[in-house]
Amino acid sequence: MNTLIIIPSRLSAKRLPGKPLLKINGLSIISHVFQKARDANIGEVYVATEDQEILDDVQLNGGNVILTSNKHKTGSDRIYECYEKLDLKNIDYIINLQGDEPNIDINDLKHLNKLVKSYKVDVGTLAAEIENQSKLSNENIVKVITDKKITIENFTIAVDFKRKIKDFNLNIYHHVGVYAYKPQILKKLIS
């Protein structure tokens, strides 16, 4: 089974415009994310962007990048365009890795890839325990709510995504912003 990692990235983010090109230790955030994805060694990695500046930066740092339309409403739309332009027929899963996750643990990417392939699920995602009570009320942190504690045995269950949490008795996790989906499911999601 083959996996493709696509990292959507654009300069016009609402909270912090230009974020992908901000430097950490002399390297742009988007190039850090690309390197982490490549280091996971689970498949080819591409950045999908509408911005020439991001394309230039990623290429300068040895990354693969596809220029996409600037008309997309979501990163998923951008990812699907990239996938179509690549015209790869043997991809079983596409991992959507957000372009602002330079601290992503490559073992988490490997684990997600292994789980979706083992269980042959249509969609998988990553969530982490919320260790700080103040993060529960932070609307900028996307939450995952489940009816039971997430463990390795039930990781593949469906979850609801919420930004505003009112009932703190639920099992609430921080959504990491990484998805894995079968290409045909991604196509349905963007339709």
Question: What is the predicted role of each segment?
Answer:
Residues 42, 88-91, 119-122:
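Short, high-confidence coil segments that cap the C-terminus of an alpha-helix
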Residues 30, 100, 182:
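Residue-level signal for inorganic ion chemistry
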Residues 8, 96-98, 126-129:
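Short beta-strand segments
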Residues 38, 84-88, 117:
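Residue-level signal for alpha-helix termini/capping positions
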Residues 1-49:
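N-terminal glycine-rich phosphate-binding loop and ensuing alpha1 helix
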Residues 46, 52-111:
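Short phosphate-binding loop-to-helix
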Residues 104-191:
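Conserved core of the sugar-phosphate nucleotidyltransferase
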